[in-house]
Amino acid sequence: MHKCIDSDKLRVRINKAIGQLNAIQKMIDENAPCEQVLVQINAVKGAMHRIGLIILQGHLSHCVREGIEAGDAEETIANFSEALERFSRLS
């Protein structure tokens, strides 16, 4: 991955999602109510969505801009469209 994102910011978000996943595993091991587990699953889903947004924003701000400035507009836009399509399928 190019240096198009703030790795430290992304790492913090990823660690938060990992913590939430570990909490889900613990809840399952402790037979927590399904409703509470689902709340945590939704929190992880939201965290992963925010991670994806950070990556997309960085890609747009840096990689797409650089590609267009370098004269590779068509390929750059096609790559961004593909990335956006993949991200939108995650929800």
Annotate each predicted stretch with a short phrase:
Residues 1-91:
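Solvent-exposed interaction patches of small proteins and small membrane subunits
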